[in-house]
Amino acid sequence: MLLQLRMRELSIDLFSISFLSTITSAIGSLATPFWGALSDESKSRKKILLIAISVALVVLPGYTIAKRAAHFFFVAAIFTFFSSAFDPISIAIFVESSKLNSNAVVSIVNAVNSLGMGMGRIVISPLLNLLSVVHVMLILFFVALTMLYFVQRTAVVPHHRYEIQRTNLQRVFSAITSKSVLKKKNLWAMYLGSFLRQLGIGGTFALIAVYLVEEVGMKKSATILLASANSLMQVPSHFLAAWMMRKVPSKYVAAFGMLTSGLGALLFVPADSTLTVLLAYAVSGFGFGTFINGATGFVIENVPVNRRAEFLGLLTSVRSFGSLFGPLLAGWLATFSFTLVFVTMGSIMIFGSIVTWVYCQR
């Protein structure tokens, strides 16, 4: 949201703002399976993660000096490529280093991520009343630097390595072409449902800051504060998902999350006050927690152990691929009506939940 606000300050058009999300999604969709596959082959996942995050942090301050849309696109492309290593590698490290059930580990990790995002938005909101968007971005950069310390302290955990050496191109596309794995319990349907859910959510939030400021009439600081409800609501939903997966198959948990995400998008249609916007954010956040835990659990249950990070990377990849098209579609639909944006995106996510529910096997 800070990038949306900064680009709007520079009088950059709505389509370019939404196109930034498309660029990050396109790069992320290719980068995440690459980093996951590379870490599966590597002796040390930690080393790969440390190198990638270090480069990403070097590039991150570039956002503060960007003046044109092309500048933002350039910084986003490089930053996204290297930062895409974090999700698949970190999840694999946590699962392999913990004695807890993998579903419990994933829920805890996701809850911590959501709590961090929620607290970040709560902190950012008052800062925007005191400082410029650029100064707030610089503060967040210095906070992000502390990540290097914690990654460095991560233990090197032995893992089942994927012994076949592949080219970089093969690392990118190996998972998506593994038909035997994707057909197991119709794993492909989970990836398709995740793609549709992310297409919808990416379109819903691609221009949300602009919508709340220019259409609803909210202050910039208020939009950030209300957005924290999305992340904070994810925290209990992560733990609820872990409990649900002990009772029902993970595919149902994921489908429920997709359905709830769709309802969250639809709630933005009548939202015209602080309370109604807060409700829409909260429902959407609740949907994410159950979706991501169910989807991640289903993937872990149905892929080879020595290709775990690769297929977790593919999950992030298809979600990024969905975010590639979502903002583009939203940018076009917004020229007609923001209501059309939210109705379309909500409907797409609900359809994704139906695909997952019907085709994924228990």
Regions found by a protein language model. Name each.
Residues 77-113, 298:
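Cytoplasmic helix-loop-helix junction between adjacent transmembrane helices
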Residues 157-192:
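Juxtamembrane intracellular "pre-TM" segments in multi-pass secondary transporters
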Residues 31-44, 128, 237-249, 334:
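Helix-to-loop junctions at the C-terminal end of transmembrane segments
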Residues 135-152, 342-357:
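Symmetry-related core transmembrane helices of the 12-TM Major Facilitator Superfamily/SLC fold
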Residues 47-61, 252-266:
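Structural signature of the two symmetry-related core transmembrane helices
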Residues 19-37, 228-240:
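Central cavity-lining transmembrane alpha-helices of secondary-active solute carriers
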Residues 70-85, 195, 276-290:
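Hydrophobic core of transmembrane alpha-helices in multi-pass small-molecule transporters
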Residues 1-25, 188-193, 198-219:
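Helix-loop boundary and gating motifs at the non-cytosolic
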